[in-house]
Amino acid sequence: VTNPQHDTRIDFIYLSEPEMIEAGVGDLAKCVETMEETLILLARGDYRMAGASGNSHGAQINFPDNPEHEGMPANGPDRRFMAMPAYIGGRFRTTGVKWYGSNVENRKRDLPRSIHLFILNDSDTGAPLAVMSANTLSAYRTGAVPGVGVKHLAVENAETVGIIGPGVMSRTIFSASLTQRPTIKNLKIKGRSAGSTERAAQWFREKFPEVNVEVVETEQEAIEGSDIIIGGTSTSPDGPSGFPYFKTEWLKPGALVLAPAAARFDDDFVTSDARLVVDFKGLYAEWFNENGPDVTYEQLLGIPGNRWWDMVQEGTLKESDLANIGDIADGLVQGRTNDEEIFFYSIGGMPVEDVSWATDLYENAVSKGIGTKLNLWDVPELS
């Protein structure tokens, strides 16, 4: 029986994509600050994600290559559905889940490859606080997490950035990098096709007229002389031979490589000279546990942190060779000590990042009266 003294009404707000923009989803300087807080909370342990260890990236639905049932989708590149739930503590103390479907064929319909929705919940009652259009939420937090690496690991006077794979992810990463290193004045771009690369270059020129933008023909040209290198190429069906290759000899002393996607490094350099940083070690450990030792990083995602965790299991790296960016930001682990060190920063992406940024945007929306209020119930029918 419902206690008449209790207010049982539950309302939540819906935020469309234009309303998310109005609420500040694209404020990358602020988003970098929020991601830094989030990564510190991760390193301190004030979070929960899915899975046995609380570190899972999420739960994924894949499809068979040749479905036996009419209407069932068939497997294809980036063809999946995924739910990514998490709780984040600190000043946030909220819980949420990002849910998305992905299909490269969407491009033919003038739609994004993946379409995202986010639900933010009260961590005490479980009641929904907000339902959000989440493509921009996901894109900007994805750019801001590498931005935390730029803040703590890039040389102070960084001037030149090289991009391999100038898609949406690389654009938001570059935008976030500029908030942390306004000294950047040169950008080199290497893409897969001339047409899409030139379109990307034009986007950068219009967005950042103060930056000199150059299209280059090879990965080597994009890497050589760059203070910051962004690898934004999705996993190749050709395996490692199709991944961007960051050859040791091409890397400028002091370079920072941001690797949120498939990338290939020289193992001997990784084990001897490079400084290795990850967004969170627990994520890569859980990926390894979920997929088993027979699924190598090449088959999984191609993200360098997966390869480094394989090497930890092989004994060619020690776990202590990997540093959490949150521990560096928290002052517990030494960051850059000189302008010669080369850093590799692997970013896998985690739902805690969506939850924290969504919480900030929800609070902005409420304070500004943005969004549509929807009612779940006044009094629950079943209680």
Kindly label every feature range from the protein language model.
Residues 181-182, 245-253, 268-272:
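Short, conserved loop/helix-junction motifs that constitute active-site signature segments
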Residues 1-139, 145-147, 157, 352-355, ...:
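N-terminal ligand-binding/catalytic initiation module
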Residues 180-207:
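NAD(P)-binding Rossmann-fold cofactor-contacting core
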Residues 224-225, 236-256:
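Rossmann-fold NAD(P) dinucleotide-binding segment
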Residues 17-25, 263-264, 268-381:
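Adenosine-phosphate binding glycine-rich loop
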Residues 141-162, 168-182:
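Short internal alpha-helix immediately C-terminal to a glycine-rich phosphate-binding loop
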Residues 233-237, 261-262, 281:
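Short glycine-/small-residue-rich Rossmann-like dinucleotide-binding loops
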